[in-house]
Structures are given as C-alpha cells and as structure tokens.
Amino acid sequence: MKHKPIDNELKYLDERSRDIFRHIVEAYLNDGEPVGSRNLSRLLQQTLSPATIRNVMSDLEHLGLIYAPHVSAGRMPTQSGLRFFVDAFMEAGDLPNEERENIEMQVKEAGHAQSVEHFLVQASRVLSDLSRGAGLVLATKQEGTLKHIEFVRLDREHALAVLVTQQGEVENRIVHLPEGVTHAQLTEATNFLNAHIQGRTLSEAKEEIACLCAETRAALDDLSHHLVETGLALLGGEGADHKIHLIVRGRSNLLEDVKAEEDLERLRHLFDDLETRESMAQLLDLTDEGSGVRIFIGSENKLFSLSGSSLVVAPYRDSQQRVIGALGVIGPTRLNYARIVPMVDYTAQLVSQLLR
C-alpha cells in the first residue's frame, strides 16, 4: 500500500489532529488492533462526535500517517506514522530504578563469574525478558594473545596448522605443502614463527613478521619461507565478517504477536536475516554511524525490510571508545519504544563499562 510521503504539512497539524493521531498510535502499541471513531471518542478528553473524528482520521490517512488494514476496520499507524510519532511525541524517560537494578545485577553477576561471551548472552537474555521482544548482541571477536603455532604433517602434500592462543583457543586448518618439504623445514618454519608471534595479537604478529621480510629471506630457504607465508595466511583468518558473532535470545517472544499467516511469513524472513553474516556486518556499520540509540522502523531498516520488524539498537565501546559491538531489541513495529530506548541505552553503557 502506497502512502503520500510525509512532508512539511505535518508541522501544521492542529492540536485536535495531533491528539487523535497520538491516541490511535498508543492504542495500536498497546494491543496491535485498529481503533475506530467510536472507541476514540471514549478515549479522548475533549468531547468530539464520531463524525468529527472520522473527518480528522480521513485527513490523517491522506497524509500517510494511518491506514485501514481492511474494509470497515478502524485505523492503524503506517510505518511513516510510527516514525512521526517517535520523532514528534515519544518521550523516552529514565529507566525505572527497579529495572536498572535488575539489569545491573544480572549482567554484572554473569560478567564476574563467567566468560565475556556468557555475560553478553546474559545481556541479550535480560533485554529479551524485559522487552518481550528478541534481545540481540552483536559482538566482534576480540584478538587473542598468541601462544604458538605448529605444523603437523599429515601426508606428503598436506599438514595440519595448529594455532593456539594464551586464552586456550585453538584454530586448526589443513594447508597444502610445496613439493619436497622436509620435516626439518617444517620445524624451521615453526620455530621462526613462534619466535616472533608469542605474546602478540594476530595483527601485531603479522605486522612484526612483515617488517622482517628481508631477515626471513636470509634466515630461511625458499621452502621454509613458503611455510612461513602459509602461517601468516592462517593468522589472517577468514575475513572481518568471520569475527562477527551474533547472540539472540527470546525468539519465542516474537511468536506471541503472530495473528495471521502473513505474520508467520514476516518472522520467517526475520529469522533468515538474523542468520546472514553479511547482514550482521552491515548492522554493525549502521550502528557505528550513530553516537547513541538508533531506532529503525519497518522498511527504514534495509536489513530487515522484508520482515517489517523494528529494531532499537545501541553500540557498546572499549576503553578507547571504539565501537566493538552492538546490542538491542528487535520485534514487531508496535514495540514500546519509550520504554525500550532507555533500557537499551543503559544496557549498552553497562556492557561498555564492564568490558573496559
């Protein structure tokens, strides 16, 4: 359904039109149902006849703020109407002390007792429980400090390259060996790499060995040098998107809002999008563009446009104020934005503090 684009006409909406529009949106956010003129007349403080209300609703529909989902139905806000409501009417207040303490207690307990991943999982679970949407955390995999690398020969043409970090993480990869490589050359390449990578991060180790290119050539024969380059390729990983880790909790909450077949199709698209690593990388980029909480409503968010979902998201940062991840709530367009915005904002600030 196409609507007239929202323009400067909205600036000149009279108080009565704004009041009626606000009540339509608030009723929709409360129960997800269209509201008719008779129900509106009971909700409004001022006394207006259903006929007068219908005339105002017609004007609001012409502006693209509301629509009728089917014949003889009441009216619901469009995505553009929800955006206008969020920008013009919504007041995101302070998070209630009870919810603030609840978030802080659960996230801090997880942070003290378990790994970073466990405490990020808890952050997504808390957001899900409090919002009744799906809580998500997008984390960039932090570089570990390297302990050693080893080449284990499998046959004449292949070896298993094993990379171990000080944190106990192990990465294995089968590599192709140049023809004629001896056991002594495998050992020589392993010793050279370990002498220069131990105690460094992946990026630091690559930079260190790149600076030693001439020394490497002088110290190693051609086949051993080839193995060193193979080890460097292993340090490079599989690209930036491989480092992005998505944590989602509360998917079942989204099923509570399903009212029709099209809602199930919307959720199918959403779950497909959440499994796409490229989408997650783009989402992190979008979050990095803003300094605080961002709200994407329906098709405004190109990543989830097919699902028609809304996303409230905020970045969290390291001690150098670099964005290292994002967290938020995703759900139907009738999210309680005024409540969820401060919730997401506070959780992002708390996670940033605990990661420093």
From Swiss-Prot:
InterPro entries: GAF-like_dom_sf (IPR029016), HrcA (IPR002571), HrcA_C (IPR021153), WH-like_DNA-bd_sf (IPR036388), WH_DNA-bd_sf (IPR036390), WHTH_HrcA_DNA-bd (IPR005104), WHTH_transcript_rep_HrcA_IDD (IPR023120). Gene3D superfamilies: 3.30.450.40, Heat-inducible transcription repressor hrca homolog, domain 3 (3.30.390.60), Winged helix-like DNA-binding domain superfamily/Winged helix DNA-binding domain (1.10.10.10). One of its GO terms (molecular function) is DNA binding. The keyword Lipid metabolism does not apply. Keywords: Repressor, Stress response, Transcription, Transcription regulation. One of its GO terms (biological process) is negative regulation of DNA-templated transcription. HAMAP family: HrcA. Belongs to the HrcA family. Negative regulator of class I heat shock genes (grpE-dnaK-dnaJ and groELS operons). Prevents heat-shock induction of these operons. This is Heat-inducible transcription repressor HrcA. The gene is hrcA.
